[in-house]
Design a protein with these regions (language model features):
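Extracellular/oxidizing-compartment recognition motifs
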Residues: 20-297
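Bacterial Sec-dependent N-terminal signal peptides
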Residues: 1-21
Length: 297
């Protein structure tokens, strides 16, 4: 059965792959929709630690890149496409790699333009100390699966009871992973340009403290005194497992761990006020810290 499934996915890859923007080679979860977040991973064996290594990456959505479990994403919020223009990234990952097994993992979420199947294009290239080059790309040998408890459709939904950070480790073993296919022909075509648009990386610019707080038994309103682009971050302690918070309409479900943090993981908003509501039984005392994370424009 396993080999039959692999044969089907490989056939889909051949049938659905076609001319790519900027030479990109797209991969997609075989059964995509408008809101699911998808996890991608692949283990590569390197003969020695590379002298230089880079990743070229493009996406129709928002992505986060991990190398050997370390976050290698240049931006806090990494947007793959803007106004139908593909934002290509080149990321130096030399310091993250080692001799032997190396795992590359990507967390994908849909972007503003709802493109179901142009999810990820990734190339790994570089050279060793003896000047021998190497090259790999994301293809049908990678693995992918939907993120359980995570979706993004204008607003984020994140269930921290289900999420495990181990998915991006080499030792992680779990069922439900399948091979990706190529992009489908009914998907969005991005604008061709002679030169790639200048892509500025958004960084943490300032951590803001609340200017004013209004609380009641059902929730609160946090006023930071001025509008900023970024996210609020709540540090939560001793919340009951399954407690649900809504932050400006974005949903966060508590894991029940002693300390956890609720914030926007996929997108940034330009806001001055944040309205938070919560389940019965949650208390203001469960929130030990409130911060506004302002990012550079």
């Amino acid at each position: 059965m396993r080999y039959f499934t692999i044969l089907i996915f490989t056939t889909l890859w051949v049938l659905n792959s076609y001319a790519q923007e900027f030479g990109t080679h797209w991969v997609s979860y075989p059964f995509p929709n408008d809101s699911s977040e998808i996890l991608y991973r692949k283990i590569y064996h390197l003969d020695q630690k590379p002298l230089k290594a880079e990743i070229n990456m493009a996406s129709g959505g928002n992505t986060r890149l991990y190398i050997n479990e370390r976050n290698a994403t240049p931006s806090i919020f990494s947007e793959g496409a803007r106004d139908s223009i593909l934002l290509m990234q080149t990321i130096d990952i030399s310091r993250y790699l080692k001799k032997g097994e190396n795992i590359i993992a990507v967390w994908y979420a849909p972007g503003r333009i709802r493109n179901k199947s142009k999810q990820l294009s990734l190339e790994l290239h570089g050279w060793y100390t003896d000047s021998v080059p190497f090259y790999h790309k994301a293809d049908e040998t990678w693995w992918c699966k939907p993120l359980k408890g995570g979706s993004y459709n204008e607003k984020e939904h994140f269930d921290n009871r289900i999420y495990t950070t181990e998915w991006k480790s080499a030792e992680y073993q779990s069922s439900g992973w399948v091979h990706p296919t190529g992009a489908f022909k009914d998907t969005v075509n991005y604008i061709f340009v002679d030169q790639l648009p200048y892509l500025t990386q958004n960084k943490l610019q300032m951590v803001l403290e609340p200017y004013q707080e209004e609380f009641n038994h059902q929730g609160c309103r946090i006023d930071f005194g001025r509008p900023f682009r970024g996210t609020i971050r709540l540090t939560i302690r001793n919340a009951s497992k399954g407690t649900t918070l809504h932050i400006n309409g974005n949903q966060y479900v508590c894991s029940g761990e002693m300390d956890e943090q609720a914030y926007y993981r996929i997108h940034a908003e330009h806001q001055k006020d944040f309205v938070i509501t919560w389940d019965k039984g949650f208390r203001r005392s469960n929130i030990t810290n409130i911060e506004g994370l302002e990012i550079s424009e």
